Amino acid sequence: MTNWNYQLTHFVTSAPDIRHLPADTGIEVAFAGRSNAGKSSALNTLTNQKSLARTSKTPGRTQLINLFEVAEGKRLVDLPGYGYAQVPEEMKIKWQRALGEYLEKRLCLKGLVVLMDIRHPLKDLDQQMIEWAVESDIQVLVLLTKADKLASGARKAQVNMVREAVLAFNGDIQVEPFSSLKKSGVDKLRQKLDSWFNEIPPQEAVEDAE
């Protein structure tokens, strides 16, 4: 199994919606989460780059789908943050439609990383993202971010509670604590990404079967 070097990850392009994304080939893994879930920090920690994904002081700034290449045909996709109160309702609906469309229609999407603040997990939109992924047979890794904010006992209790709760989705869902500050949980994230990126791209599997 190849262990991909995530430090080589570089920005490729931004797209306002699925129609403007590059060709639907290779393998993509998407990162999704509420606007304050620590998504940009997690991407920066994973790649050991300070500003690969810009951390905005204004949640909800990232309205584009941002694509980063790990290696040829292997991409990380930073989806727009969702659930920020000060974004107009019309824009919220537009984003949610774009997120749903991406999860349902993007053939090269292999896995979804859903990031949630460990203190406030499984909000409605988090559950919606997991539901969309499960409906599309996409594996999910839930990262409970800012795990350093809780003492060890409370952290374990939250992780166990979320692991129990996601059983109701009947999907392939892994739940892990994560802290960008302490760099904890990064190994689990890399292992999961490696397993996704080492699979045969869907379109190549179809060609082999013909």
Swiss-Prot record:
Mg(2+) binds at S40, T62. GO terms for molecular function: GTP binding; metal ion binding. Its cofactor is Mg(2+). Residues 25-199 form the EngB-type G domain. GO terms for cellular component: cytosol. The keyword Zinc does not apply. GTP binds at residues 33-40, 60-64, 78-81, 145-148, 178-180. GO terms for biological process: division septum assembly. Keywords: Cell cycle, Cell division, GTP-binding, Magnesium, Metal-binding, Nucleotide-binding, Septation. The keyword Phosphoprotein does not apply. Pfam families: MMR_HSR1. Transmembrane segments: none annotated. Belongs to the TRAFAC class TrmE-Era-EngA-EngB-Septin-like GTPase superfamily. EngB GTPase family. Necessary for normal cell division and for the maintenance of normal septation. PANTHER family: ENGB-TYPE G DOMAIN-CONTAINING PROTEIN (PTHR11649:SF13), MSS1/TRME-RELATED GTP-BINDING PROTEIN (PTHR11649). This is Probable GTP-binding protein EngB.
